[in-house]
C-alpha cells in the first residue's frame, strides 16, 4: 500500500523519479499498481544496492539529499529548496538508519507534541508538496 501511495504522490507533485534500494518492495506488484492508480507505470524508477549507494550516486550528481524523519533537525518548511532535491524515506516503523540521519541534513514535519509520527506515504505527500515547484 505504501509503495503505491508513494508513487501516486510522486506523480501528483511532479517528482522526476522514485529511486529505491534493494529492501523496497516491487512497485510493479499488482496491489502497488492499483493503489498508485497507475502512477507506478508512469513515474520512472530505479533501484540501487543500498540506501548509502543511492545517496552516494545522488550526491555525485549534485542533488540536495534530505532525510525525512520525525526526529529531523530542521522543520521542512524552513529548508532552502535546491534546484535538484531528493527526499530519502525510511521504512515504516524503524525509519532511516542512524548512519544516514547523521550524514545528511534531516528534516521533520512539525506535528502536535502529543503525536510523533505519520504513515510514510502521508509524510512523503506532505514533504513532496512542500518541495514541489510548479
Region spans (language model):
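Structured adenosyl-cofactor binding patch, chiefly the S-adenosyl-L-methionine
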Residues: 9-13, 26-40, 98-134
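Glycine-rich nucleotide phosphate-binding loop and flanking beta-alpha elements
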Residues: 1, 26, 72-74, 94-96, ...
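A sequence-level detector of short, solvent-exposed, charge-rich linear segments
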Residues: 43, 47-48, 52, 56, ...
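Active-site/ligand-binding-proximal alpha/beta "capping" segment
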Residues: 66-115
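RNA substrate-binding interface of SAM-dependent RNA methyltransferases
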Residues: 1-71
